[in-house]
Amino acid sequence: MNKYDLIERLNNRFTALEAGLQALHQQLEDLPLLAARVFSLPEIEKGTEHQPIMHIPVNATVGAAARDLAIQHYQRLFIHHQGQNVSSKAALRLPGVLCFSVTESQLATCQKSIQHINQLKTELEHIITVESGLPSEQRFEFVHTHLHGLITLNTYRTITPLINPSSVRFGWANKHIIKNVTREDVLAQLNKSLNAGRAVPPFSREQWVELISQEINDVQRLPEQARLKIKRPVKVQPIARVWYQEQQKQVQHPCPMPLIAFCQLQSAAELPKLGELTDYDANQIKHKYKPDAKPLQLLVPRLHLYLEI
């Protein structure tokens, strides 16, 4: 597909996403609200994105005000939707849940809308990250040339519907993403960055070439069968634990934005029980079981690349 067709599809899908979100906004406002609870987290200021997080204060909002915050949050896709001092590198998060009473017909309509929105989000992510053929260093420029100020992570995040949950409770997850990679995988990634022709701030073009070249040399010196891992810390994330009484089943969802619970109630006793999200305190985290990890040597700090020793 040529570049102009790709750009046209990017713009068409985004226009359709905005229209789909607006349609869902109207559908949700027309439904009877049973309960709503969202938890506002502090905005991340520019320059503080990579600082370790030790404490997150939480501010709860309930009822119609929570519903309005949630609907607004689904549509916050651009930098200009947030304050001037707020980082554009860190996506906004608003964990929580909205509970609506629905008929069979209303449920089908809302499910169709959410499925359509999520499909558009997935297509946009695929266009930007795969079909563009660009390394990550060049995607920012590509996106902001055609959709200036777009916050890609907010755009990619899908909306999660729940059908007749018995309870929704909240907590925090703190973990690493660990991925086994080969020496050839890493060299291919580094060479792609070297040939991209664009430095990553705060490096100048010359500094960037020097850094990548040094990283390539370090990896090339390894034996072919070296066991390599990318072990990248994931910033603490809000999660929701959803319990379904009839199926005797619990499902855990990441919760960067409010879940939407659709309830077909026979009585008030069936109203889902909603939990609170307490403040996060890193010093209070207790691990039930933490297995001994194999010793690792940090090889390329920028990529969180480790050598198993």
Curated annotation (Swiss-Prot):
Q: Where in the cell is it found?
A: Cytoplasm
Give a GO cellular-component term: cytoplasm
List keywords of the entry alphabetically.
Answer: Cytoplasm, DNA replication, DNA-binding
- Report whether DNA-binding shows up as a keyword of the record: yes
- A single GO molecular function term of this UniProt record: DNA binding
Name the principal localization, coarsely classed. cytoplasm
Please name the Pfam families in this protein's record.
Ter
Matching Gene3D superfamilies, A to Z? 3.30.54.10, Replication terminator Tus, domain 1 superfamily/Replication terminator Tus
Question: What does the entry give for GO biological process?
Answer: DNA replication termination
Which family does the similarity line name? Answer: Belongs to the Tus family.
Summarize the protein's role.
Answer: Trans-acting protein required for termination of DNA replication. Binds to DNA replication terminator sequences (terA to terF) to prevent the passage of replication forks. The termination efficiency will be affected by the affinity of this protein for the terminator sequence.
Name it: DNA replication terminus site-binding protein
- The scientific name of the source species is Yersinia enterocolitica serotype O:8 / biotype 1B (strain NCTC 13174 / 8081)
